[in-house]
Amino acid sequence: MGHKIHPTGLRLGITQEHRSRWYASSKTYPSLLQEDDRIRKFIHKKYGSAGISDVLIARKADQLEVELKTARPGVLVGRQGSGIEDLRAGIQKTVGDKSRQVRINVVEVERVDGDAFLLAEYIAQQLEKRVAFRRTIRMAVQRAQRAGVLGLKIQVSGRLNGAEIARTEWTREGRVPLHTLRADIDYATKVGKTTYGVLGIKVWVFKGEVLNEQSQTMPVGANPRRRASRRPQQFEDRSNEG
């Protein structure tokens, strides 16, 4: 079953956390869930060039907190935080309540080439440029290995290289233990739109095993001194605080 079920859903509460963190009654739950979906679609559509890998949404009373994990935080923040104000206004317009308090936190992705969504996005961009899929997959694997991941699996489905008959091709490097619940598996899907039709892209990234809440195995090739020398950027929005 580990190969069939969604890797993130299987590990919720173990190595993965919920993308939406809030509670609601049975009457308001559907509308809030649809609201989260609209917010995510708006952010990915308008800020697709910022390399946003994840959008975490939390709700506290009448306040909405949105955390963005991105490869290029400068694109979102803008000059003197002007991008944050535009993003807040866009979210308020999307939810249909301009008086809603929206707090935005922008967190830089520490290892871009070790993120499953950003790797899938890179593969989709290359395939849309009509680069051969085997070359694209090989380049993605090399980038992930340089980032120090323990294992990687990539699957591409569709009319590969414009073939008449659609097929599925996949490759795996290193370990990807999908049956191990304590394994930190980063999973993402992406659709590449080509002149021959759409291509489905799936990426599994194995980052290590979480032994307990305090310690986690470091990926092979990771240098702790080098990682400590440059901390990932984090921009916390405090404009709504009195």
Swiss-Prot record:
One of its GO terms (molecular function) is mRNA binding. One of its GO terms (cellular component) is cytosolic small ribosomal subunit. Pfam families: KH_2, Ribosomal_S3_C. Residues 216-242 are annotated as: Disordered. Binds the lower part of the 30S subunit head. Binds mRNA in the 70S ribosome, positioning it for translation. PANTHER family: 30S/40S RIBOSOMAL PROTEIN S3, SMALL RIBOSOMAL SUBUNIT PROTEIN US3C. This is Small ribosomal subunit protein uS3. It comes from Synechococcus sp. (strain CC9902). The lineage of its organism: Bacteria, Bacillati, Cyanobacteriota, Cyanophyceae, Synechococcales. The gene is rpsC.
